[in-house]
Amino acid sequence: MIFRTLGKSNLQVSAVGLGCMGLSHAYGAPADKEDIMTLLANAVDMGYTFFDTAEIYGTPDNPHLNEEMVGEALAPYRNKVVIATKFGIRFDHPELPGNHPLIPDSRPEIIRAAVEGSLRRLRTDHIDLYYQHRIDKNVEPEVVADTMSELIKEGKILHWGISETTEQYLRRAHEVCPVTAVQNRYSMMARWHESLFPVCKELGVGFVAFSPLANGVLSECYNTESKFDAQTDYRAAMPQYQKDSFEKNKCLFEMIEQLAMEKHATPAQVSLAWMMSKKPWIVPIPGTRCLCRLKENIGAADISFSQDEVMAIDKALSSMGISDVFGGSRIVDKAQ
C-alpha cells in the first residue's frame, strides 16, 4: 500500500482511507453488524490503515453505533491502524426522519465528555486524530485549540484537526496548537475548498477529502432510475441525485468515462486519483459497504495524473455545467 503523511506531522496513513459514516448513518438502514466486521477486517487486509468515524454517526436509538462497531472491528488491529473521530456537534431532533440540522457545541467541558465517550466506544486508550466536527461560533478557536493541547499532553489524543474549517479559523487555531489535518468536502463536483490549499501548504496541514465521489454519484453506478428511502437515506434529497441533474452532469460523466478508458481504470478511481495527483498531502476517504468497491477505491492509489493532465481536467471542470451537490447538513445556532 502507498502511504501519505498528513502535512508536516508524523502521521502516516494509507493513501486512501475509509469513511465509515455510511455503515450506520445517512445511507439507509445500518448495515448488518457481521457484514461490517467482515468489511473492516478485509479493509485492513487490503492495506487500509486510515478509518474515519464520529460520535454521532448512529441511529436515533443508538447515536454512537458507528464508533462502537468501528472500535470492535478494529480492536484486533489497533497497533496497525489510524482511527479518526470527531466531537462538537449534535443533531436537532434526531428522533425525526430525514436530514437533521446540526447544533455545534465545542465548549471545553463538552469536548472532555466527548473524548471519554469516544475512547470507551473505540476500545482504545488514545485517539490518533480528533476533529472538531463543525465550527462553533460561540467558542473561540483558541479555546478549542487550547483544549486540544491539553488532551495531547494527557495522551488522550495524538493529533487534532478541523472539519469544514475556514482559513481564518484554521490560522487562529493552529497558532495555539498545530493542526494536523483539515477535513472538508472535496470532489470534481465540489471544488470550493481548493481555496484552502495555499494555507494548508504554508502551515503544513494535511487535507482529508470527505465525499470525494460526491456521495457516490461519481462512481457512475447510479442513474435516473435509482431509488433511495427518503426516511433514512440522505441521497433522496441530494441535488446531484435528482433526475434533471443526471442530464446536467452528462458532460462530466462522459469526461470521466474517457479518462477511465485512457487510464484503464474505473470512474471512481479516476475521480480519486485526480485529487491525489494534485497534492501529496491530500487523502480521500470514500465510504462503501461493498467489498468490491473497497478494493476498487484503494486501487486508485496506483493511478496518477501528470500536472498537465490535472490542469486540463480542472480547466474542463470549470467550463462545463455541473449540478449542485449536497454541501453538508444545515447548521443551527441554539443557546448553550
What is the meaning of each model-derived region?
Residues H64, F91-D105:
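Surface-exposed, active-site-proximal loop segments in enzymatic domains
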Residues P30-A43, S106-R121, T166-R172:
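Short, acidic/polar
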Residues I135-M320, V332-Q336:
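Beta/alpha (TIM)-barrel catalytic core signal, keyed to glycine-rich beta->alpha loops juxtaposed to Asp/Glu
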Residues M1-V82, I322:
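N-terminal binding-site loop/beta-alpha segment at the start of enzyme catalytic domains
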Residues D45, G71-N79, R120-R123, I152, ...:
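Acidic (Asp/Glu)-rich catalytic clusters
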Residues L119-K137:
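Active-site groove signature of glycoside hydrolases
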Residues S24, E55-P60, R134-K137, Y186-M189:
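Short histidine/acidic/glycine/proline-rich micro-motifs that form metal-
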Residues V13-G17, T49-F50, K80-K86, H126-Y130, ...:
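Structural preference for beta-strand elements that scaffold enzyme active sites
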